[in-house]
Amino acid sequence: MTSQTFTTSSATPPTRGVVPDKPALEGLEVKWGKIWEDEQLYAFDATTVDSREQVFAIDTPPPTVSGHLHPGHVFSYTHTDTVARYQRMRGKKVFYPMGWDDNGLPTERRVQNYYGVRCDPSLPYDPDFTPPSKPNPKRQVPISRRNFVELCVELTAVDEKTFQDLWRAVGLSVDWNQLYTTISPESQRIAQLAFLRNYARGEAYLSDAPTLWDVTFSTAVAQAELEARDYPGAYHRLGFHRPNGEDVFIETTRPELLAACCALIAHPDDERYQHLFGTTVTTPLYGVEVPVLAHSAAEMDKGAGIAMCCTFGDLTDVAWWRELQLPTRTIIGRDGRILSETPQWIIDAGSAERYEAIAGKTTFTARKLVVEALVESGEMDGEPKPTQRKANFYEKGDKPLEIIGTRQWYIRNGGRDDDLRNALLERGRELEWVPEHMRHRYENWVEGLNGDWLISRQRFFGVPFPVWYPLGTDGEPDYDHPLLPDESALPVDPASQPPSGYQESQRGVAGGFIGDPDVMDTWATSSLTPQIVTGWERDADLFAKTFPMDFAPEAHDIIRTWVFSRVVRAHLENGMLPWKRAAISGFVTDPDRKKMSKSKGNTVVPTEIIDQFGADAVRWRAAMARPGMDSPFDKAQMKVGRRLAMKILNASKFVLGFGEGGQVCDITNPADLSMLAGLRELIAEATEAFDKFNYTAALEVCEQFFWTFCDDYLELIKERAYDSEGADNAGALSARTALRLALDVMLRLFAPFLPFVTEEVWSWWKDGSVHTSSWPTADEVPATGDVDLMSDVSAALVELRGVKSTHKVPMRTPILSARISAPASVIANLKAVESDLTKVSKTESLTFLTGGDKLVLEAELGEPPAKRKK
């Protein structure tokens, strides 16, 4: 773990016990961020922990630092921080690390575009290499793998600082001493160690099999990284030839794969084709004999009802190939082009010539050429029929995936093992989901898995597989007997280190070795974040006090990736869940509820909105986004949060301006006791909501109470609170004591949401930090008041103010006489605070009448006061 210190030259130590003349929100983030860092306010000290129950451990998602910052980052990470701050105030030792997911394909792509380079592993290392002064992403300079990795490390360091500056500005209470990266030596050690353990138990294996392949990035892709997108295509009706001269017509959107056809498949119950099962036909253009077979996955109502099986056009082809034990006929290479060498199953010269016409071409060009040849040969019936088909894409790619036979590493995840699948489904039921319905997304994903987890990538900046392969006397690698390092040697890099018992000079020669050339998918490392941060196989004491963790926040789009992969790894390695609960955030959309994207021009830069409105305003808006629900972004809403933060400053200054209060026993006035009774209920409601991880509900009740407190209670009692030398000394003391008690409690209730403004006000009159103070409990507040009293007073104030608003006169306008009629219980409450009520409403004569089922006011207004000079 590395420690990074936040420094600033503009922060000044706070002057405690002094209320500023003009409170302001500006500068609070820098001021308090510096102080919190200097005081190590949020640092976790395992030596102070006696038992696991004392700790609240958070598995924070390590953001992909090569990505673009957007409001969704701020919202979801703020949600986590409100929970962390609440748990800290409840007395928990909060273990709240932060990490950066800095390896993998997104980082490589950013480095390529930023520096105008590409990795060519065949090139030697150049210690004096300098990136182009004017990078051109379209003319990338080839560099060695080592040079490329160095640039990845260099750029991620810059990106990581940008993220860290944002998180500090937002006020995340993470422990920056626990900072980690997914490419650090320690993370590599953990990833390689877990892999070796998986391999030893038979949970990780190497297989040469059909693989989803992205031709742009030249790498394998896992099922969890797929996106099904609409893709324009056309159905082509092709005739396959029977020995008797009849044709069997199929319809396909991929005629370029005709040379890879190994069978025709129809449903066993389809009467149209039952007489063909067990016979053979020959393919158009290439004259290759293929069988006609039955399989229940064939769709009778799709196209002609009979389909050609090619290796491989889609995942259905893979299933048919595997279950019907069909031959492999590969014609597409890793670059997405038709293989140059004519396949051995294409025999006659004319067919070979037709294949040579498409050899080396992209699939798009090959499709066009094949269709032209089919038209010329008369083997295509009619014109192509345009259609929109669903195609699998890599989530970060822009071309449909191909399926190519390659050798890859896998980890078992239940995709082909019902017992393991059921065990992982049961883990999902053990897990507490916030909100609960998100569990169904997990279950749907696990139930829909069709293969094991492919974890190898044909890329460069990632965690290497700790594997070498011995070379036989013929120079061929023995993949069945890999060479593995001792755990104590980890981390290792097989590309630059020889295995034990070999010399570097034996690399790549007969009788020597080769290193596994691939790296682990970034999810294979980030799936181990619970183990990385808790000290698994590094710090037994820390691990015992923090694992399994308590809380795993994430967005709903990564349930299939990050949630599931961590459950898999912890189940296999630790025999348990990695954490007790998962909290799912929604997306932040634009005001039209469309997903924000750079290409649409509807993104917002988080630092700009923080600079404009302040961090507390942004945090308020974030907390108003309910768990699991998408939330539209609107800058106008930030103004509401800023207004709340500013009101806390000004109302606090106002309250503290009344002077010192007394003891709780000095609170005797019915209005004061009623307000505190409401506060007591608020504490219970906010606590219950937070205990259910419903931060939005907690904020809503706090804010509702606060505005009523300011608009009604403060206005009602301010004359009495000022009157410390008058006849009602006890009433003034009661008001001032109630005010300070309420302010104390409300600051603590708001602290998880608005950490900067609450800390600022706390420093005016309290020692220490509001964030290390205790969460309020109902026992702190008197329970003798009637909570309905202030509700009735608020209703009366609405009427008294309303009569002035109706007549469009200032609120300072006196009411000569007023009569309030209401039910007896309401009248009794109003009489109890008659003195405060007449003062605040400037009513000279107030009478009450019992009757009716609602409050009714009759009033006579006096002359409006003269306008005050500005």
Swiss-Prot record:
- What keywords is this UniProt entry annotated with? Aminoacyl-tRNA synthetase, ATP-binding, Cytoplasm, Ligase, Nucleotide-binding, Protein biosynthesis
Q: What is this protein called?
A: Valine--tRNA ligase
Write out the similarity annotation: Belongs to the class-I aminoacyl-tRNA synthetase family. ValS type 2 subfamily.
- Leader sequence segment: none
Show the ranges annotated as biased composition (Polar residues): 1-13
- Localization, UniProt: Cytoplasm
Q: Where is this motif: 'HIGH' region?
A: 63-73
Gene Ontology biological-process entries: valyl-tRNA aminoacylation
Q: State its role.
A: Catalyzes the attachment of valine to tRNA(Val). As ValRS can inadvertently accommodate and process structurally similar amino acids such as threonine, to avoid such errors, it has a 'posttransfer' editing activity that hydrolyzes mischarged Thr-tRNA(Val) in a tRNA-dependent manner.
Quote the subunit structure annotation.
Monomer.
Location of motif 'KMSKS' region in this chain is 595-599
Q: Coiled-coil regions in this chain?
A: none
